[in-house]
């Protein structure tokens, strides 16, 4: 994408949702509940378009999500002056309002995801194990561990058993190395 078009920020709706979720969890905020309902509607549009190709997903978003997002931002814009600037509610609202172009960018291309949850889920094991891997032995060993983790996550992303995938890849690489 970056070779054919300028780089474009596409914000993650899961991060926006999380801010309102935490707000609602902390004090049962009706404003946060309303925001969560509106964001859930956007995810419902995505569920409907899950198996669509890029152009169909784009058209579906234009027809179903665009007006919902405009209404959400209109609502937040009207609500913002009524919320104390230091309040957690203001921070959640401002997070969205200040990044409106990035949050609406996914509407412009059916290839853009609504969030980056798949990427975050793929790197979660690395983040969790980070302290365990501080002392991999050397920089080279750390690079090797990163290469193996890349293979494991690639296998998972393509619905393959990581153990079987690694066995096959490593076996084939040994065969290739031993051939004259």
Each model region followed by its residue ranges:
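Residue-level detector of conserved catalytic or cofactor/ligand-binding positions
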Residues: 175-180
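A ubiquitous short alpha-helical element
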Residues: 30, 56-61, 133-139
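Long, amphipathic alpha-helical stalk/connector segments used for oligomerization, subunit docking
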Residues: 35-101
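Short, conserved catalytic/metal-binding motifs centered on acidic residues
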Residues: 1, 15, 96, 120-124, ...
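Short acidic (Asp/Glu) and glycine-rich catalytic loops that position anionic groups and cofactors
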Residues: 13-22, 42-53, 71-78, 101-106, ...
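Structural motif
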Residues: 28-33, 83-89, 138-143
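Conserved beta-strand -> loop -> alpha-helix junction used to position metal-binding or nucleic-acid-contacting
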Residues: 3-37
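Amphipathic alpha-helical/coiled-coil segments positioned at domain termini
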Residues: 108-174
